C-alpha cells in the first residue's frame, strides 16, 4: 500500500524524534513536539497503520514505537531533508588535511578520523584497489639466476614488489630493454587493462624485445593484485561504544563487522565503480547487520574510481547530516588524491 501524505508526515516526525532521543516515540510526544496538525487520537490511528504496514514496531514496555529497517529505508529514500554543510564546517574538514604532508596514506588515515569525528560513528576508508590504480613506472631487476624482481610504481604513490621465476638467465641489460618497452606501452593504464588488453596486443604485434615475448605471460600473471594489499583505515571505535552502550548484541555485531577486514574490503569494493552516495540499512547488507547502517561513496583519481569511504553506525544515525558529510568528503579526497598523483 502506498503511504499517504499523512502517513509520511507522521513517519518522518517519529524517525526524527527517535534519532534525536533514542527512545520509543508515542502519539503524545509527536503531538507536543511536532507541528503535525493532527489530534493525538488521529496520530495513534496513523501509527497503528504504519505498524501494520511494517514501517514501525511496538515497544510494549513503553507504549511507544520505533522505526523498523523498512521504516528507515523509506525515510532515507523519500523523507530525509539533507543538511547543507556550512562554510565553517567545510573549512574545518579541509584544515584537517592541511596539518600533514600530502601523502596518500596520510590523507586516507585523516579521512577516517574526519568522518568519525563529524558523524559520531566509525569512519572507514578503503585504500586504492590495486587493479584500478594506474601504472606510473615499471622496473625489472635481475636478482639471481632464475629470479627477477618486478617493481611497480603506481600513480597513487603505492609501490608493489613482485618476484618472477623464469626458466633461463636474463642479463640486466636485457631486462632494461624490456623495462623500457613496458614503460613506453603500459604507463597510464591500470592493471586490469594491462593484463587483459595491452599485453595481449603487444604479444600479437611482436614489435618488442624477444625477451619480452618469452616472459610476457609471467609479467602479466605477477601483476595480479592480492586483496590483502588493499589498506583499510578505521577510526571511531569509542563512538560505537557510546552509541550502542545499551544494546550489547548490536555492539557485538558491529564490532565483529569491523574486525572482519576481508568482508569490509569486499563489501566496500562493490561500491567503487558506482557514483553517488549509498545507504545500506541492516539486512540490506551482505550479511546480518541488525541495527547497523553504512553510508558509503567512492573517491577518484582524475576520472578513475579507485577506492571507497564511508561511515558505520547505528540505524538511528543522523542521516540528514551524515549523507552530505560523506558526499563532501569523497569529493574533497578525490581532489587531493588527483593532485598528489600528478
UniProtKB/Swiss-Prot annotation:
GO terms for molecular function: DNA binding. SUPFAM superfamilies: GAF domain-like, Winged helix' DNA-binding domain. Pfam families: HrcA. One of its GO terms (biological process) is negative regulation of DNA-templated transcription. The keyword Transcription applies. Signal peptide: none annotated. Keywords: Repressor, Stress response, Transcription, Transcription regulation. Belongs to the HrcA family. Negative regulator of class I heat shock genes (grpE-dnaK-dnaJ and groELS operons). Prevents heat-shock induction of these operons. HAMAP family: HrcA. This is Heat-inducible transcription repressor HrcA.
Amino acid at each position: 500500500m502506498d503511504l499517504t501524505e499523512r502517513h509520511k508526515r507522521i513517519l518522518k516526525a517519529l524517525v526524527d524524534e527517535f534519532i534525536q532521543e533514542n527512545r520509543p516515540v508515542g502519539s503524545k510526544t509527536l503531538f507536543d513536539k511536532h507541528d503535525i496538525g493532527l489530534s493525538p487520537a488521529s496520530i495513534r490511528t496513523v501509527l497503528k497503520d504504519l505498524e501494520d504496514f511494517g514501517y514501525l514496531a511496538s515497544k510494549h514496555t513503553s507504549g511507544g514505537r520505533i522505526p523498523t529497517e523498512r521504516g528507515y529505508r523509506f525515510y532515507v529514500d523519500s523523507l530525509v531533508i539533507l543538511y547543507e554543510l556550512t562554510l565553517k564546517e567545510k573549512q574545518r574538514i579541509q584544515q584537517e588535511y592541511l596539518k600533514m604532508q600530502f601523502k596518500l596514506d596520510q590523507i586516507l588515515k585523516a579521512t577516517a578520523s574526519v568522518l568519525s569525528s563529524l558523524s559520531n560513528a566509525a569512519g572507514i576508508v578503503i585504500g586504492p584497489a590495486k587493479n584500478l590504480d594506474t601504472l606510473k613506472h615499471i622496473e625489472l631487476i635481475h636478482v639471481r639466476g632464475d629470479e627477477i624482481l618486478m617493481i611497480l610504481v603506481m600513480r597513487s604513490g603505492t609501490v608493489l614488489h613482485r618476484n618472477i621465476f623464469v626458466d633461463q638467465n636474463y642479463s640486466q641489460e636485457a631486462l632494461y630493454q624490456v623495462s623500457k618497452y613496458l614503460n613506453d606501452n603500459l604507463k597510464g593504464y591500470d592493471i586490469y587493462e594491462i593484463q587483459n588488453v595491452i599485453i595481449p596486443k603487444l604479444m600479437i604485434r611482436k614489435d618488442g624485445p624477444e625477451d619480452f615475448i618469452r616472459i610476457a605471460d609471467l609479467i602479466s600473471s605477477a601483476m595480479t593484485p592480492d586483496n590483502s594489499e588493499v589498506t583499510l583505515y578505521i577510526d571511531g571505535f569509542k563512538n560505537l561504544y557510546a552509541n550502542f552502550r545499551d544494546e550489547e548484541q548490536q555492539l557485538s555485531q558491529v564490532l565483529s563487522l569491523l574486525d572482519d577486514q576481508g568482508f569490509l574490503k569486499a563489501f566496500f569494493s562493490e561500491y567503487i565503480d558506482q557514483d553517488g552516495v549509498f545507504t545500506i540499512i541492516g539486512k540490506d547488507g551482505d550479511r546480518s547487520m541488525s541495527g547497523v547502517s553504512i553510508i558509503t561513496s567512492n573517491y577518484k583519481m582524475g576520472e578513475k574510481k579507485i577506492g571507497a569511504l564511508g561511515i558505520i553506525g547505528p540505524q538511528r544515525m543522523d542521516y540528514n547530516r551524515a549523507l552530505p558529510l560523506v558526499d563532501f568528503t569523497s569529493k574533497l579526497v578525490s581532489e587531493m588524491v588527483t593532485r598528489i598523483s600528478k
